[in-house]
């Protein structure tokens, strides 16, 4: 099981495939997505990676998070999410995941927060048909009608469809197709609509109900860590002098 990624929704557009078919796509941007912590079986009882994405202002970051980011040698992140992974797919702290983590044609599960609609009636919220427009009806044109029975059971059952707050909930869309990726601009184009407003954070993971393509990179499509310290090579002049002395 590989790690997912944190992307930002830019909006929707449409492209044309090789057969001339118009394909509606949602554009997701993956930028500065780095591993900031690991979870191991020995220390935590499970394996996972904690990812951070975006850039947050230092003065608006709490002291606890400042220490968390400085320990990982990464800049403060705007969004932090933890993804469960298998032990063979653990990533080193500081590793940056790129859009090459996914391949065109792959199926993914996309999770976002739906757009809030406020307090909505049953016709908008649950697609009720409503009551008659005339012929003696008044006031209750868009009402839900009966909410239960009489003395027995004497209550409204849980889950009864009624008016209430609509939207602003976590929604996962499964088996969404990755149409294409743009490595230079860090974009992922997925088929169809994705829950969330423009600029919202969207989680993208490998589909749990589809087989991972053989050409998908394992453990992830990564860029070299920025915090890896390279040991400086010995100057050529010093080597020649040392050899001459010997």
From Swiss-Prot:
Keywords: Methylation, Ribonucleoprotein, Ribosomal protein, RNA-binding, rRNA-binding. GO terms for molecular function: rRNA binding; structural constituent of ribosome. It comes from the Bacteria. GO terms for cellular component: cytosolic large ribosomal subunit. GO terms for biological process: translation. The keyword RNA-binding applies. Methylated by PrmB. The modification N5-methylglutamine is found at residue 151. InterPro entries: Ribosomal_uL3, Ribosomal_uL3_bac/org-type, Ribosomal_uL3_CS, Transl_B-barrel_sf. PANTHER family: 50S RIBOSOMAL PROTEIN L3, LARGE RIBOSOMAL SUBUNIT PROTEIN UL3C. One of the primary rRNA binding proteins, it binds directly near the 3'-end of the 23S rRNA, where it nucleates assembly of the 50S subunit. Belongs to the universal ribosomal protein uL3 family. Part of the 50S ribosomal subunit. Forms a cluster with proteins L14 and L19. This is Large ribosomal subunit protein uL3. It comes from Bartonella bacilliformis (strain ATCC 35685 / KC583 / Herrer 020/F12,63).
């Amino acid at each position: 099981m590989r790690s997912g990624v944190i992307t930002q929704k830019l909006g929707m557009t449409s492209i044309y495939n090789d057969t001339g078919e118009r394909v509606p796509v949602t554009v997701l941007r993956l930028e500065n997505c780095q591993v900031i912590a690991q979870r191991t079986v020995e220390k935590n009882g499970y394996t996972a990676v904690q990812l951070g994405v975006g850039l947050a202002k230092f003065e608006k970051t709490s002291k606890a998070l400042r220490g968390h980011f400085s320990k990982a040698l990464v800049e403060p992140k705007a969004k932090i999410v933890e993804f469960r992974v298998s032990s063979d797919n653990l990533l080193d702290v500081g590793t940056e995941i790129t859009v090459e983590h996914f391949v065109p044609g792959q199926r993914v599960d996309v999770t976002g927060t739906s757009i809030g609609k406020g307090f909505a009636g049953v016709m908008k919220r649950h697609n009720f048909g409503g009551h008659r427009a005339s012929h003696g009806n008044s006031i209750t044109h868009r009402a839900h009608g009966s909410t239960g029975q009489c003395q027995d059971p004497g209550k409204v059952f849980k889950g009864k469809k009624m008016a209430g707050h609509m939207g602003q909930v976590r929604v996962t869309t499964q088996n969404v197709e990755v149409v294409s990726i743009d490595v230079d601009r860090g974009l992922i184009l997925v088929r169809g609509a994705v829950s969330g407003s423009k600029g919202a954070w969207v989680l993208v993971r490998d589909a749990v109900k589809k087989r991972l393509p053989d050409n998908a990179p394992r453990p992830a499509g990564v860029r070299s860590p920025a915090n890896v310290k390279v040991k400086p090579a010995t100057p050529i002049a010093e080597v020649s002098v040392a050899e001459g002395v010997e």
